[in-house]
Structure formats: C-alpha cells, structure tokens
Regions:
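Structural recognition of an alpha-helix C-terminal capping motif at a helix-to-coil junction
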Residues: 19, 33-40, 53-65
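Solvent-exposed, charged amphipathic helical/linker segments at domain boundaries
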Residues: 141-143, 148-196
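A short, charge-rich alpha-helical start-of-domain segment used by transcription regulators
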Residues: 1-19, 29-32
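Sigma70-family region 2
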Residues: 2, 37-55, 73-75
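A short pre-motif secondary-structure segment
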Residues: 119-120
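Internal acidic/polar
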Residues: 69, 77-99
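Helix-turn-helix DNA-binding module
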Residues: 114, 126-143
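Arg/Lys-rich amphipathic alpha helix in sigma70-family domain 2
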Residues: 50, 60-81, 157, 161
Length: 196
C-alpha cells in the first residue's frame, strides 16, 4: 500500500470511519478527532506495515483502537457524557442501517457497553459480516454473536423507552409528515414548498 493508495483508501472510507467513530464515542465532533488521529497513526505506521492483506479492515481497526483510547482517557478523567453533550450529537443515516439501528439515536448507542456498541455498529451500520467483525476486534465468532444479540436487545429496550416518552402525533400530522418525506425523497421541491 503506497501513499497514493492510502490517500484514496482514506478518502473513500472517511465517511464510514466517521460514522463508526462518532457513534463509538458519542459525539460527531470527537468522532472527527478520532478519525484524524486514526489516519495520522495509519500514515505513520504505513512504512512499517509491510503487505496489508485487508487495507479497509486495517484502517478500521486503527480507528476502532483510537476510539477505545479516547473512551479510556475519558473514563480515567472521570468525564461522563452529559445531556448537553448528547443533545449536540449529529446522527447521520447510513445506507446499510438495520431497522433498530436506524431508529436508535446516538445517545442510545452511548449507553451500550463498548463491545456491544462496536459489534452493532460494525454489523448493522457499516455492514460487516460476523467473521469480519471477529477478525477486526480480535475476538471469537461466538463472542461477536453474543455481543450483537445483547446490543440489539438493549437498543430495542432503549428505543422503546424513548418512544414511550415521546408525544403521539395525530393521524393528520402523520399524514403531513409522510407527504413531506415522500416529496422530499422524490426531489419534488415545488410540491414540497406547497406543503409549507
């Protein structure tokens, strides 16, 4: 992997790395810092890395480790995720989000233990196979399956509890929201403007 190949790889993977890191650390801003740190570490390690069989996995593992480093530093400092910090989190949708992961806000991900969070993000948000996750995290396939099962169950609980506390919309309001979303997705901005 030469520097030009690395630059192309980093550019292509950057959005996925950011999605993963932001959800791991609970902040879009800190996620960006983690991605930058990971890319710097990868660039530094590149000359000594030798032949890299799976460049995407290699870079994701470096980003994963950088996110874990930030979480450890945060824990040592005793920094807790405040409600203010969670309110500032940007939750970007992914083209491969699973149903539960898509409805879970970033604040719900923050409440998962680190291993469960990693497995759910890698599988449901980034689309990695169980074997790839086991390889990336250096754990057994059984451990991945268990963490994924527990993480999804916990996310379901968190999302359901959030839904219970949210006010219910009237059917007319739901219909307006659906119409708005349909027109937006169809890029029919004239019809969208008429709704406003």
């Amino acid at each position: 992997l030469n520097h030009d190949d690395f630059a192309r790889l980093a550019a292509n993977l950057r959005p996925r790395l950011h999605r993963y890191c932001a959800r791991m650390v609970g902040s879009a801003f800190e996620g960006e810092d983690v991605v930058q740190d990971a890319l710097a570490h990868a660039m530094e390690a590149l000359p000594m890395a030798g032949k890299i069989e799976n460049p995407e996995g290699w870079l994701l593992r470096i980003a994963h480790n950088a996110a874990l480093d930030l979480l450890r530093r945060r824990k040592r400092r005793g920094t807790a995720d405040s409600e203010d910090a969670l309110a500032n989190i940007a939750d970007q949708a992914s083209e491969t989000d699973a149903r539960v992961a898509a409805t879970a806000s970033l604040s719900a991900f923050v409440h998962l233990p680190t291993l469960q969070r990693s497995c759910v993000l890698l599988s449901d948000v980034l689309g990695y196979s169980l074997a790839e996750i086991a390889d990336l995290l250096d754990i057994s396939l059984a451990a991945v399956k268990a963490a994924l099962h527990r993480g999804r169950a916990k996310l379901r609980e968190l999302v359901e509890s959030l839904e219970e506390t949210m006010p219910r919309l009237l059917e007319a309001d739901r219909a307006r929201l659906r119409a708005y979303a349909d027109r937006f997705n169809a890029r029919d901005f004239d019809a969208l403007r008429d709704l406003l």
